[in-house]
Amino acid sequence: MLNRFSYSSNAWHNLRVDGPDADGIAVIVLARSQSRNALTLPMLTDMVQLLSAMDADDSVKCIVFTGEGQFFCSGVDLTEGFGEIGKTRDTHRDAGGKLALAIHNCRKPTIAAINGTAVGVGITMTLPMSIRIAAESAKISFPFVRRGIVADAASSFYLPRLIGYGRALHLFTTGALYPAESGLLHGLFSETVNPASSTLPRALEVARDIAVNASQVGVYLTRDLIYRSLRSPEQAHLLESATLYTRYQSQDFEEGVKSFLEKRRPRFQDTMHEQSGEGVLERGDCVVSLASKPKL
């Protein structure tokens, strides 16, 4: 287990860790403001390690995530790529999903202080967190279909359960950018605050209330009881990872990234009938091929 002084180590990639303070509150800051806090694979890996350490550290009672500057997180840094893709569809594991599961499995309450725009994994990484507080001025997007891929970070598990299937489908299907106070995001944020600079102070206020007044074991067990009534995020993670592996090989993925970097509308070419046997989703004991529709 890391001691509390190790958290501020310069070894973390573009992350700043404050605390834990006397009340047991630790703050993880995405510190890459020059790139709108876009995530790199080393940042994702470091956050998983930090969560593991804080989970085992009794001096940590609550963990707050926020972004440096005016953005919370603009998603994965597409100029650096998505990291190494697994050797096979069955072995590929989405890096955002690994972070989501680390947050889900962390026994300490986690709070997202979404101080600015959050896009892609920048918003899906917050879905497993206990509480999300957003700036009224923040913009939110789940842009995966606009990049030629599918939802990541087990968000196909979390988002419908947080805001309902109808709104989740709308957000995932359009991939558009919405204001934090949009009705489509109703239920996603516990609070929206103004000005944006008050987002972190408000999150720290809530964290302090939890750290000082709530049983840590009680908080963990209560959350565990809630999730035990649902299907596991591991299932969503495996399905997303296998599908992402296939999509990473596609022309649409190449075009989605290229058009984004060139700041133009994408021209997607992939069609359903062109998908091979690799384009298969497994749902329990049911196999659904993307190459053909099942008969009803």
UniProtKB/Swiss-Prot annotation:
Stretches assigned to coiled coil: none
GO molecular function, one term: enoyl-CoA hydratase activity
Short name of any one Pfam family annotated for the protein: ECH_1
Ligase is among the record's keywords: no
Keyword entries, A-Z: Lyase, Peroxisome, Virulence
Protein's pathway: Mycotoxin biosynthesis
UniProt cross-references to SUPFAM superfamilies, sorted A to Z: ClpP/crotonase (SSF52096)
Catalyses which reaction(s): a (3S)-3-hydroxyacyl-CoA = a (2E)-enoyl-CoA + H2O; a 4-saturated-(3S)-3-hydroxyacyl-CoA = a (3E)-enoyl-CoA + H2O
EC number: 4.2.1.17
Function of the protein: Enoyl-CoA hydratase; part of the gene clusters that mediate the biosynthesis of the host-selective toxins (HSTs) ACT-toxins responsible for brown spot of tangerine disease by the tangerine pathotype which affects tangerines and mandarins. ACT-toxins consist of three moieties, 9,10-epoxy-8-hydroxy-9-methyl-decatrienoic acid (EDA), valine and a polyketide. ACT-toxin I is toxic to both citrus and pear; toxin II the 5''-deoxy derivative of ACT-toxin I, is highly toxic to pear and slightly toxic to citrus.
PANTHER family noted in UniProt: ENOYL-COA HYDRATASE_ISOMERASE FAMILY PROTEIN (AFU_ORTHOLOGUE AFUA_1G01890) (PTHR43684:SF4), PTHR43684
Designated name of the protein: Enoyl-CoA hydratase ACTT3
Record gene name: ACTT3
